[in-house]
Design a protein with these regions (language model features):
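Iron-associated oxidoreductase/ferritin-like identity signal
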Residues: 1-121
Length: 121
């Protein structure tokens, strides 16, 4: 099962990088300065990063699910705040939100499959 999940998690990571690029570009358009120092990301992030401590695929999936759910809440907040006020940022937030919901669904599906496999063993 790990061989099926790893490419999907890599795809998620690529999409997260794309999200960061979209947000950095928008910050620049608004004449702000994106955070480029990873240490600052940890300080300012609404969702905290937790480095994996267990290599078991179930643990990794659960940890990723927590992160995706936090991201969903944050992008929903941004979409709500910018609705009717900043159409460009609102559009970016809702596009990212859709991706995050898709990631959440992928992770839930994998966790469900993993649970079914365990029950059959």
């Amino acid at each position: 099962m790990r061989s099926e999940i790893e490419p999907e998690l890599l795809k998620h990571a690529e999409e997260e990088l794309y999200h960061a690029e979209l947000l950095a570009e928008r910050i620049l358009q608004l004449e702000g300065t994106p955070l480029i120092d990873p240490q600052e990301w940890f300080t300012h992030a609404g969702c905290k990063y937790a480095a994996p401590t267990d290599i078991y695929i179930g643990s990794i999936l659960n940890q990723n699910l927590i992160g995706e759910r936090c991201a969903i809440n944050r992008y929903q907040e941004i979409a709500n705040i910018t609705s009717g006020i900043d159409h460009t940022t609102h559009k970016i937030a809702t596009e990212i939100l859709e991706d995050e919901i898709e990631h959440e669904n992928d992770l839930v599906d994998y966790l469900t499959d993993l649970k079914l496999i365990k029950e059959k063993i």
